Amino acid sequence: MAQPNPLTTPPPGADTQVVPGHVEHTEAHSGAFPPFETSGFLAQLIWLALAFGLLYYLMDKIALPRIQSILHARAERLRADLDQAQAMKAEADAAGVAFETALRDAQGKARDIAQTTRNELAAEAETKRKALEDELNAKLSASEATIRTRTEAAMGNVRTIAGEAASAIVERLTGQAPDRTSLDRALDATAH
């Protein structure tokens, strides 16, 4: 069988009727507030000193070193992160400078290649132009020579045709064929 709790169970024969708003005064409640009683003041001061001493010891030896180590570790981690960030920034700056340098070099090489290509194409075009010009000059000279020989041949034929026509005209008008020598003299006189 369970034993009753002496703190919550009233003593036998006690009045258990509860009246709301009514506080019953007993001998246990008489006197001053216990912390303010001067009879146990020295014991309270000793316990206060012991409690604060124990609290100070625990704070000094356990809590504060842990907090200090946490703060120190955090400061070290922050310092390491800042150093790493500075190093990464320096690397990024160096990479940016290297990129800019490489870009300028590439642009310079591209300009050089473009200029070289333009020069090569201009030289090739000039060579082709000169070759074509030489070829055209040769064809022109050949054409002029052909025209000259054909003109001379045609003029020779014209003289023959003119001589024949003049001979036919003189023969028709006079009824006699002209002699060849006088006909050649007359043709020579009209040619100059």
UniProtKB/Swiss-Prot annotation:
The answer to whether keyword Nucleus applies is no
Q: Which InterPro entries match?
A: ATP_synth_b/b'su_bac/chlpt, ATP_synthase_B_chain
Q: Which UniProt keywords apply?
A: ATP synthesis, Cell inner membrane, Cell membrane, CF(0), Hydrogen ion transport, Ion transport, Membrane, Transmembrane, Transmembrane helix, Transport
- State where the protein is found: Cell inner membrane
Q: Subunit structure, per the record? A: F-type ATPases have 2 components, F(1) - the catalytic core - and F(0) - the membrane proton channel. F(1) has five subunits: alpha(3), beta(3), gamma(1), delta(1), epsilon(1). F(0) has three main subunits: a(1), b(2) and c(10-14). The alpha and beta chains form an alternating ring which encloses part of the gamma chain. F(1) is attached to F(0) by a central stalk formed by the gamma and epsilon chains, while a peripheral stalk is formed by the delta and b chains.
Its function, per the record, reads:
F(1)F(0) ATP synthase produces ATP from ADP in the presence of a proton or sodium gradient. F-type ATPases consist of two structural domains, F(1) containing the extramembraneous catalytic core and F(0) containing the membrane proton channel, linked together by a central stalk and a peripheral stalk. During catalysis, ATP synthesis in the catalytic domain of F(1) is coupled via a rotary mechanism of the central stalk subunits to proton translocation. Component of the F(0) channel, it forms part of the peripheral stalk, linking F(1) to F(0). The b'-subunit is a diverged and duplicated form of b found in plants and photosynthetic bacteria.
Which protein is depicted? Answer: ATP synthase subunit b 2
Q: Which organism is it from?
A: Methylobacterium radiotolerans (strain ATCC 27329 / DSM 1819 / JCM 2831 / NBRC 15690 / NCIMB 10815 / 0-1)
What lineage is on file?
Answer: Bacteria, Pseudomonadati, Pseudomonadota, Alphaproteobacteria, Hyphomicrobiales
Gene name, per UniProt, is: atpF2
